[in-house]
From Swiss-Prot:
Family note: Belongs to the universal ribosomal protein uL10 family.
Name of the molecule in the record: Large ribosomal subunit protein uL10
Organism: Saccharopolyspora erythraea (strain ATCC 11635 / DSM 40517 / JCM 4748 / NBRC 13426 / NCIMB 8594 / NRRL 2338)
GO molecular function (one): large ribosomal subunit rRNA binding
Gene3D superfamilies: 3.30.70.1730
A biological process term (GO) from this entry: translation
Alphabetized UniProt keyword annotations: Ribonucleoprotein, Ribosomal protein, RNA-binding, rRNA-binding
Gene Ontology CC: one annotated term: ribosome
Length: 177
């Protein structure tokens, strides 16, 4: 008979798997509670960092239909459940792991499939959504400015031509006199 607290834990983890856009599995062996708190703060509001027993996580993953992660659930396991954009959380995990060698990124789950450590790091290397939108807006503005200059060029050219003809006529009339 399963204990109610374990059933609740499995249900909670399964729900997190279902509601998260991504999950990153880590090993936290050797991290102090203070470091774990620091990591949770670095991850931000959209990410929940949950330490759990491997057997409970395996059951929750199975219950959620998450496959391909069983080999990651070895040793002290904690999972970062990411709701929203995974880039910022992946960056925070990568930076924290760089500064704290005790945190090891094992892999993750995103878009219905397992992802490797290198894929998590690739996600961390991407620009955030806001930065990408800013770059796109800048590129669009530059193209609009180019288009405006292109459309204004014939009118400017015609005005210069008219001014040159006017000067030529005025110069020609003064020579004829």
């Amino acid at each position: 008979m399963a204990k109610p607290d374990k059933v609740d834990a499995v249900t909670e983890i399964a729900e997190r798997f279902n509601t998260s856009t991504a999950a990153v599995v880590t090993e936290y062996r050797g991290l102090s509670m203070a470091k774990l708190v620091q990591l949770r703060r670095a991850l931000g509001e959209g990410t929940t960092y949950r330490v759990a027993k491997n057997t409970l996580v395996k059951r929750a993953a199975e219950q959620s239909g998450v496959e391909g992660l069983d080999e990651l659930f070895v040793g002290p396991t904690a999972i970062a459940f990411i709701e929203g954009e995974p880039v910022d959380a992946a960056k925070a995990l990568k930076e924290f792991a760089k500064d704290n060698k005790a945190l090891v990124i094992k892999g993750g789950y995103m878009d219905g499939r397992p992802i490797s450590v290198s894929e998590v790091e690739s996600i961390a290397d991407l620009d955030s959504r806001e930065v990408t939108l800013g770059k796109l807006a800048g590129a669009m503005k530059a193209k609009m400015n180019q288009a405006a200059a292109l459309f204004a060029a014939p009118a400017t050219k015609a005005a210069r031509l008219a001014a040159a003809l006017q000067e030529k006529r005025e110069g020609g009339e003064s020579d004829a006199s």
